[in-house]
Amino acid sequence: MAALLRRLLQRERPSAASGRPVGRREANLGTDAGVAVRVRFAPSPTGFLHLGGLRTALYNYIFAKKYQGSFILRLEDTDQTRVVPGAAENIEDMLEWAGIPPDESPRRGGPAGPYQQSQRLELYAQATEALLKTGAAYPCFCSPQRLELLKKEALRNHQTPRYDNRCRNMSQEQVAQKLAKDPKPAIRFRLEQVVPAFQDLVYGWNRHEVASVEGDPVIMKSDGFPTYHLACVVDDHHMGISHVLRGSEWLVSTAKHLLLYQALGWQPPHFAHLPLLLNRDGSKLSKRQGDVFLEHFAADGFLPDSLLDIITNCGSGFAENQMGRTLPELITQFNLTQVTCHSALLDLEKLPEFNRLHLQRLVSNESQRRQLVGKLQVLVEEAFGCQLQNRDVLNPVYVERILLLRQGHICRLQDLVSPVYSYLWTRPAVGRAQLDAISEKVDVIAKRVLGLLERSSMSLTQDMLNGELKKLSEGLEGTKYSNVMKLLRMALSGQQQGPPVAEMMLALGPKEVRERIQKVVSS
């Protein structure tokens, strides 16, 4: 870079940047036939993937798939001091877990790689050289100390800090003298006063006069790493990105990016800036909130589809809000023109209900139910382990029966290994005294239930059991039907509340019900 700067000193610098001007575009999605739709999700690996990032990735994914396009993961890791170990792997892992894997990525590779900015430095250097040659960029020799003083002075005067463009109009002699002392200066981009208007697919026509509110930005740091503004423009161009769907916080920077496209003579992509995802109270969804990271939700048993559902249901882009949408339905129903400018308010208290709906859908599907059976077996082993008196509870037939009976009643698979459902896997410690406190007719009730099981153990249904249990309580003077149910619930589960007794009996099966009742009565 220093050698290039010296060569440029031998030539006359043009007074204005060259490049093809960016014209006004028609207000359409740019998805006409023959257009190769390519979008990118470009997070910085400065932290693990959280809900805000997932939403941006999802909108890119469903837009790409709706138009038979490609979804690219690019890691913007040029600020090496802030890179968090394991974050890059976590981001791609969580995208795959969520069911929205990239078509091209650091892990998967692809024709436009590498997909980490730290491995694309030569491209940024080439773009910087091109900008220096046309005079659209210039070296800056200002020290960090001077820049800090500028910032403090502006704040002291209640002004917005900005660079004063001190190095913008240095003479060739001045540049040569500075290069002799500092051969690796930062490179700044010369902001133009005339900024092209652009049609944002969400916010409409925009124009931000950046030169009037900020100084010329650094595009290449002295360490040879680019800043975000240059890197994203260079990468989007070389990767053939057709549409940039990103957070609305980048809307004001788009004019700067368009000036870079113009100076480099490149055609810019279509831009769509997505409104922010906020907490229900309107506060910012912060990475500092540990429970917004995807790995937290995965560990807690929330399904990917429920997260995709809730983060789209709270925002816009669809004709109506609707709980329970699957990923294929999201792709089919998504309409970028229906994304509004209003922030999306996320109410995570509703997530269990979203998860309940999606879990119920999985249970009702035979092949997916088999996968849930395997996962629940693992959960039971982990939760109870050596406490299992009877390992028959791990039998797939038994586990599947539990899932079918409790579908629609549980929000997470983990709920089935909570203390409330421990009776399904281990026998409760219930003494005779606990039953006597409920009714004096313990032996009579037990005898009738055992007789019922003997007569009809092969044809038990919940409706039949409900009817038989009501008949069973008839003729028991001083004992109400409700007390009979309390007694049986206590004998079977050791709990005073829970699912209907008839369902408990169906879940446990005639053999286990018989053994539990006999054990308690004889204790």
Curated annotation (Swiss-Prot):
Coiled coil: none annotated. Keywords: Acetylation, Aminoacyl-tRNA synthetase, ATP-binding, Disease variant, Ligase, Mitochondrion, Nucleotide-binding, Primary mitochondrial disease, Protein biosynthesis, RNA-binding, Transit peptide. It is an enzyme of class 6 (ligase). ATP binds at H50, E249, K284, L285, S286, K287, R288. Pfam families: Anticodon_2, tRNA-synt_1c. L-glutamate binds at R40, F41, A42, E76, Y228, H229, L230, A231, C232, R246. A motif ('HIGH' region) lies at residues 45-53. Residues 1-41 form a transit peptide. Gene3D superfamilies: 1.10.10.350, HUPs. GO terms for biological process: glutamyl-tRNA aminoacylation; tRNA aminoacylation for mitochondrial protein translation. It catalyses: tRNA(Glx) + L-glutamate + ATP = L-glutamyl-tRNA(Glx) + AMP + diphosphate; tRNA(Glu) + L-glutamate + ATP = L-glutamyl-tRNA(Glu) + AMP + diphosphate; tRNA(Gln) + L-glutamate + ATP = L-glutamyl-tRNA(Gln) + AMP + diphosphate. GO terms for cellular component: mitochondrial matrix; mitochondrion. The modification N6-succinyllysine is found at K256. Its main location: mitochondrion. A motif ('KMSKS' region) lies at residues 284-288. InterPro entries: aa-tRNA-synth_I_cd-bd, aa-tRNA-synth_I_codon-bd_sub2, aa-tRNA-synth_I_CS, aa_tRNA-synth_I_cd-bd_sf, Glu-tRNA-ligase_bac/mito, Glu/Gln-tRNA-synth, Glu/Gln-tRNA-synth_Ib_cat-dom, GluQ/Sye. It is found in: Mitochondrion matrix. Its EC number is 6.1.1.24, 6.1.1.17. One of its GO terms (molecular function) is ATP binding. It is linked to Combined oxidative phosphorylation deficiency 12: An autosomal recessive, mitochondrial, neurologic disorder characterized by onset in infancy of hypotonia and delayed psychomotor development, or early developmental regression, associated with T2-weighted hyperintensities in the deep cerebral white matter, brainstem, and cerebellar white matter. Serum lactate is increased due to a defect in mitochondrial respiration. Non-discriminating glutamyl-tRNA synthetase that catalyzes aminoacylation of both mitochondrial tRNA(Glu) and tRNA(Gln) and participates in RNA aminoacylation for mitochondrial protein translation. Attachs glutamate to tRNA(Glu) or tRNA(Gln) in a two-step reaction: glutamate is first activated by ATP to form Glu-AMP and then transferred to the acceptor end of tRNA(Glu) or tRNA(Gln). In vitro, cytoplasmic tRNA(Gln) is slightly glutamylated, but with low activity. NCBIfam families: gltX_bact. Belongs to the class-I aminoacyl-tRNA synthetase family. Glutamate--tRNA ligase type 1 subfamily. This is Nondiscriminating glutamyl-tRNA synthetase EARS2, mitochondrial. It comes from Homo sapiens. The gene is EARS2.
